[in-house]
Amino acid sequence: VAVYYDQALTEFAYIEYSETGNEEYNIASGQSHVELFNAVLPAMFDSVVLVDSIEAASELGVDAIFAPVIEEFQLALPAKTKLDVYEVWIKYNMRLMTSEGDYIADWVLTSYGKTPTESLRSAEAAINEAAVVALRDLASSFSLSFTQVPEVRDWLTTL
């Protein structure tokens, strides 16, 4: 399987602005998403190769191309929600294509993480911990649900 990470994923950053329009939090997590998939995918497939483009994958004659996309990122702060937790919610669009770039499967996965405010000393540490929990949630739900996606299951029977 070839894996393609587009620039939007590798350089992903979520910026939370204050009510006055000033940057309050900047969560640059693109590399964390890449590292997560780079850890999970080799456990799921015999061979995983990173490619710089869909076209490059086509030239390799791989069985499929996997290209994850972050569709949405939400951050919930105690000051805004009036709850004593920091929460991170991430919505992904998982795309699996043939080596020619044609659709095999396209499905949505969400991940969620939260951290109680009293467990950490700073907002930055709490947000980071909530994001780590959300990424762990993604790793487990992706690996456990992959073969449950009907189009993926159908594709796997052709290999």
What spans do the regions from the language model cover?
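Surface-exposed short loop/turn segments
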Residues: 52-106
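Short secondary-structure boundary motifs at beta->alpha junctions and helix caps
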Residues: 18, 22-29, 97-148
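Amphipathic alpha-helical segments that form well-ordered structural scaffolds
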Residues: 35-44, 137, 141
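Generic short beta-strand segments
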Residues: 6-10, 69-75, 110-112
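Short beta-strand->alpha-helix linker/helix-N-cap micro-motif
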Residues: 38-60
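A structural "domain/chain start" motif
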Residues: 1-39, 144-159
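A general alpha-helical scaffold signature found inside nucleotide-binding enzyme cores
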Residues: 32, 87-91, 129, 133
